[in-house]
Every structure is written in structure tokens, then in C-alpha cells.
A protein has these predicted regions:
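Short beta-strand/loop motif that positions the catalytic acidic residue
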Residues: 185, 191-193, 197
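C-terminal catalytic histidine-bearing segment of alpha/beta-hydrolase fold enzymes
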Residues: 213, 218-271
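Primarily recognizes the serine-hydrolase "nucleophile elbow" in alpha/beta-hydrolase
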Residues: 124-185
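Active-site loop/turn elements of alpha/beta-hydrolase fold enzymes
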Residues: 86, 93, 172, 224-226
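Serine-hydrolase catalytic machinery in alpha/beta-hydrolase-like enzymes
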Residues: 34-136, 234-248
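Bacterial N-terminal signal peptides
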Residues: 10-22
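Acidic catalytic loop of the alpha/beta-hydrolase fold
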Residues: 196-200, 229
């Protein structure tokens, strides 16, 4: 069955949770935890957010950061998800302390992290295991969303057949040397991209559509006309000015993509 929709406008790993570095309270009920963990001997630092007053277990959502690294924006997305009723884990794909302040550093971190797809999958799966085992989480209900670099990561996890209920990519690269295979893609996929995103050319958009259609994947792709790269991040305009980058925040695209994401989660987790 082809469940495609298009709207235009197991890798070896060694995981150990080493230490919860800090915990805090963002609101009366929201708890946050900075979690240090190891994958194949390397240390990573993630951020868990959840409502500890909510009854029972709930779905978990992984948040994969932009190419800058695990930053405040990623943590804010985890907090937004917690406020919406989920337990969210903003994972770390680069390693503790690797947070770029300059595009050259971001590019170097990303290149090192993605040099081996087995390494990418191991780091993702370690975070997935951490989230699924959290006391507040129903481990059978897990989604993942990513931004820019993170958007490409979550799409590749879907291509690789990782057990996820939903995947959401925001302004992420859509092309990949990994290709989806028929019957292998498990999650429902939402892709939100900017029609004027110079980092995601139109051939990537059409290529993803064909790839997922051929694989029988459940894809919803929304392209916002005139919208540029990094449209979800309010800090994009400052970065664009500082480094002369073709990126820009777009309030309406950010709002509509977030609303679409919440509708997706409500739907896939309703059982």
C-alpha cells in the first residue's frame, strides 16, 4: 500500500548512563535533567524534559540538534514537547562540549559525526534507549524530530528501518546516499522545508518524494513558498547577519510546522 502524501504551499553500541549532572524545574510541573551518557567509550550530554505531575507513562520524543550542536534551541524544543504532554530528550550527536560558535566549527563537527553511518546510528540508538527506559515513558511509543543536520539524521534513521512511530524533519537535507527500501520504513514522516532554502534544492525535494513513494512510505511534505533555511529558529536572523548566511526565521512557517507536528503525534500516539 502506498501511503504517500505530498502537500506543497541494529548497530553495535555500548551505552552507559554515567551521571545525571543536574536537574531543575522550568515550571511548576516540568522537570528537566541534564544527562551525561557514554556511547562506545565517548561521553555525550543530553537534556530530558517531562511533566512529573502527569499520571501514567507517555510517549517519548527525541530531539536532534542543528549542525551547531546540542544548544539552547534544542533544549527549548524538548521543553515545548514536555509542555505538550510528552517526555522529550534532546540528544547529543557530537560529544560533550562540542558546540560550534562558527560555521567552520559546525561543519567540522558534523563531518566527524557523520563519517560513518554505523556511528550515527549508534549515537541515535543510545539516546533512543535512554528515552525509552525513562520512568515516565511508554517505550513502545517513540518519535524523533530534527532540525537542519538533525532533520537529515532522523530521515536517515527512518530509511534504516529504526523502530519509530513518527519522524519530523525541519529544514533538513533531504538527499542521502542511503535509500529507503520498500517495506522497511516504519514511521510516518513529516517534512517541513522552505521553498527558498538554498541548502535544500528542489531536486532534493522531488528526489525524496519519489524515493518515499517507491518505498511505500507514509510521507507528508510541506514546502513553504519564499521561506529560507532555519525558519524555525528565532536566532537565525542574527546568525545570517554575522556570517552572511542565507538563513532566516519565519514565524508563520515555524508556527504551522509545530502545529502540524503536534497533530501528527496526537494521531500516531492515539492508540
Amino acid at each position: 500500500m502506498n501511503r504517500y502524501r505530498h502537500a506543497l504551499a541494529a548497530t553495535p553500541l555500548s551505552l552507559a548512563v554515567v551521571l545525571t549532572l543536574a536537574s531543575g524545574q522550568v515550571t511548576a510541573d516540568m522537570q528537566t535533567e541534564t544527562v551525561e551518557y557514554t556511547v562506545n567509550g565517548e561521553t555525550f550530554t543530553g537534556y530530558m524534559a517531562y511533566d512529573d505531575e502527569a499520571e501514567g507513562k507517555r510517549p517519548g520524543v527525541l530531539v536532534v540538534h542543528e549542525w551547531w550542536g546540542h544548544n539552547e534551541f534544542a533544549r527549548e524544543q524538548a521543553e515545548k514537547l514536555a509542555a505538550a504532554g510528552y517526555t522529550a530528550f534532546a540528544l547529543d550527536m557530537y560529544g560533550s562540549g562540542k558546540l560550534a560558535e562558527h560555521p567552520e566549527d559546525a561543519q567540522a563537527f558534523m563531518k566527524e559525526a557523520t563519517k560513518d553511518i554505523d556511528q550515527v546510528k549508534a549515537r541515535f540508538m543510545a539516546a533512543r534507549e535512554l528515552l525509552a527506559k525513562h520512568d515516565s515513558v511508554d517505550g513502545s511509543k517513540i518519535a524523533a524530530q530534527g532540525y537542519c543536520f538533525g532533520g537529515a539524521v532522523v530521515l536517515n534513521m527512518a530509511r534504516l528501518g529504526v523502530d519509530l512511530d513518527a519522524v519530523v524533519s525541519y529544514h533538513g537535507a533531504l538527499g542521502s546516499p542511503i535509500k529507503a527500501e520498500a517495506g522497511k520504513v516504519q514511521p510516518r514522516i513529516h517534512v517541513y522545508t522552505g521553498g527558498a532554502d538554498k541548502m535544500v534544492p528542489s531536486d532534493q525535494v522531488s528526489g525524496l518524494v519519489k524515493e518515499m513513494q517507491d518505498a511505500g512510505a507514509d510521507l507528508t511534505l510541506v514546502s513553504f513558498p519564499g521561506v529560507m533555511h532555519s525558519f524555525t529558529n528565532p536566532g537565525a536572523d542574527k546568525v545570517a547577519e554575522e556570517f552572511n548566511m542565507p538563513i532566516a526565521y519565519d514565524e508563520q512557517a515555524a508556527k504551522r510546522s509545530w502545529e502540524g507536528t503536534l497533530r501528527l503525534y496526537e494521531d500516531v500516539f492515539s492508540d
